[in-house]
Amino acid sequence: MAVTSDRKNNRKKAITKFNDLDFVPTISDSEEDVPDLDDSDDELLTSENKSVKTPAKSKKGKKNDPVKINGNGDEVAEDLNPDFRFNIDGGELSTNFQGWDFVGDQKENDDDMKKDVDLDGIIRRKGGLLNMAHIEVAEEEEEEEEEEEEEEEEEEEELAMDGFGMGATKKNEQEEAGDEDDDDNEEEEEEEVDDDKEDDDEEREEDTAEEMASFYAPESESSEATSTVHSTFNSLTLSRPVLKGLSDLGYTKPSPIQSATIPIGLSGKDIIAGAVTGSGKTAAFMIPIIERLLYKPAKVASTRVIVLTPTRELAIQIADVGKKIGKYVSGLTFGLAVGGLNLRQQEQELKTRPDIVIATPGRFIDHVRNSSSFNVDSVEVLVMDEADRMLEEGFQEELNEILTLLPSKRQTLLFSATMNSRIKSLISLSLRKPVRIMINPPKQAAARLTQEFVRIRKRDHLKPALLFYLIRKLDGTGQKRIVVFVARKEMAHKLRIILGLLGMKVGELHGSLTQEQRLQSVNNFKSLEVPVLICTDLASRGLDIPKIEVVINFDMPKSYEIYLHRVGRTARAGREGRSVTFVGESSQDRSIVRSAIKSVEESSSKNKAVSRNVEWTQIEETNKLVESFGETIDDILVEEKQEKEILRAEMQLRKGENMIKHKKEIQSRPKRTWFQSEAEKKNAKILDTLQKNKKTVNSKKRKRLEALEDNDNSRSYKKTQKDRVVDQERSMKKQKIANGKKSKNKKKFNKR
């Protein structure tokens, strides 16, 4: 009791002494006047640093003992907190950041029922994935010497604009059409390729100076933003919680896009920003958003920020970026609304009205229309990541619907590596004098990227063997992350089987997988459990997985913009990277190579474009082994299909049991609505396909496509020669009958 009364008296003296001051004093103002209030708190030490008692000392002596001994026998001063640890580098360099987390549903009751086919198990039963296929390869020392010689050759063989015969005139070659696949309007670039659109970008009309002056903010604002260089995040006047979150991520200096956009974002102005891949665009819009949310009303829960992305994986990644940056901001909440994940779980999350909602367009509209307690009336900021993709035809209808749902008075931020600045496509977004910030020249690859090209000529059948050869050459130990891009998901799946039979474990990522399988593939690749990931253009945008050393373009993309997004998965954030592209003889392939070489020649960065030489004799030997797997591959596909059918039947059985068990609850749920009818969705899909392929929309074509849709894409009946003969005979009979009637009528008329 005496101790507590002394402490109260000391506090009163300290308060009365500083009562007349106009400022709040700190300890450094007068260290002598700081009352000693913690004399009685010396016993509150942690369990790790318990004092070692000596038998000859009394309680009084123990209190006055200035030194204690911890469990390790080390002396510790009593006035120091034993749990305190000095952070020598201020958290700037000692980060253990290993990349963003890709976490889907947190399922509480996850039953043990098998949900996916074990493809690796099937391949293993057929003799694959055991030992790496051994094709006659030189010894390790000779390999290293060859690699060194090859690198020297590559440096000498830098491609010029006429490389690969780029100056030769060739007839346009038709590429095979890919199957249509509309999986939640995601980034599945599998439609028909048309070589005639290789010069589309050159033919596209450019905005006039008058149009740009009336639409954009004054050029002075943009130039001032890009010319102002911030050496640290402290100079951006950010709050301490945000700075602490950035420090934990290892962010020490803002990138050019962050330095330019953060001050404008904090001021509430609209932004249209573009920068090369891996330059930190996600943090560039997330930092000012979180900083502004520090000043939100504490007691009113409402959704204030919407972030739209074209793919589910990108949305999950952005949510993790935001959570890590806002880790120390109290009361900041995030919500996720993406397709493929648990709908009810997302509804419960959105009922709490999180501050920031990251979503894909389709699922966002679904929740706004059908989820109770979730509304967007208080939205203040709309962000569109990969905005050029979001403005394309595939998302147009949904984007227009979203813009009608959101308040017109809002801040809009558009970000992309290949930002389309056409004013015509931006008018629908209701932007208010947006500030246009383009850090790098448009359509430029990241710095420190080495772009290699392998000329295939007429050896398309050797591409799987070439892929195996390159992966072994670039990473024989399986310690590098390699991404392989293909045009079609069927090819991605087939390559996984082929490489598995050759003893190489790889993953796949495309729209035919469930969302759980997709996230599992990304996480396995991130943890190097699977060092090679074969994917479609679903993964070409936004995904930031650390230390991807190599990108291989197994199939050439259909445009240079998609090529930039693909190779942008490596050489991120100032790191070195390498891309290897298989180049065919089509004019489209040549056009993309020309654009890449031109970009390298015009840039002042350290990237380069070279021709890669390969051992075709060794690749042909590997191809013989691949061709011998023909029947085995078919057997694996058949067995996989059978297992899928069994799993599907089990799922339907379980679904039926649940419908019987929870019949009343299911029937009591209101029917979910959509802003388009089935007929409208079908017409929009057809028009979208026709416009993408640059074909005229006429009624005959539309009716044929609608008939195909109604018949589940089954082929319409085509007349045979026999049918034509029958039709001709029938028409001739009708003509004879008609002529006979005419002659009879004529005779009757003459008699009269």
Swiss-Prot record:
Biased composition (Acidic residues): 29-45, 138-160, 175-210
Top class in the EC scheme: hydrolase
Family annotation (Gene3D superfamilies): P-loop containing nucleotide triphosphate hydrolases
Keyword Metal-binding: no
PROSITE patterns in the cross-refs: DEAD_ATP_HELICASE, HELICASE_ATP_BIND_1, HELICASE_CTER, Q_MOTIF
Chemical reaction(s) catalysed: ATP + H2O = ADP + phosphate + H(+)
Organism lineage string: Eukaryota, Fungi, Dikarya, Ascomycota, Saccharomycotina
Keywords of the record: ATP-binding, Coiled coil, Helicase, Hydrolase, Nucleotide-binding, Nucleus, Ribosome biogenesis, RNA-binding
Protein name listed in UniProt: ATP-dependent RNA helicase DRS1
Domain spans labelled Helicase ATP-binding: 262-437
Coiled-coil portions: 631-698
Organism: Vanderwaltozyma polyspora (strain ATCC 22028 / DSM 70294 / BCRC 21397 / CBS 2163 / NBRC 10782 / NRRL Y-8283 / UCD 57-17)
The EC number(s) this enzyme carries: 3.6.4.13
General function of this protein: ATP-binding RNA helicase involved in ribosome assembly.
Residue ranges, compositional bias (Basic residues): 695-704, 733-752
Motif (Q motif): 231-259
Subcellular location: Nucleus, Nucleolus
Annotated positions binding ATP: 275-282
Amino acid composition bias (Basic and acidic residues), ranges on this chain: 712-732
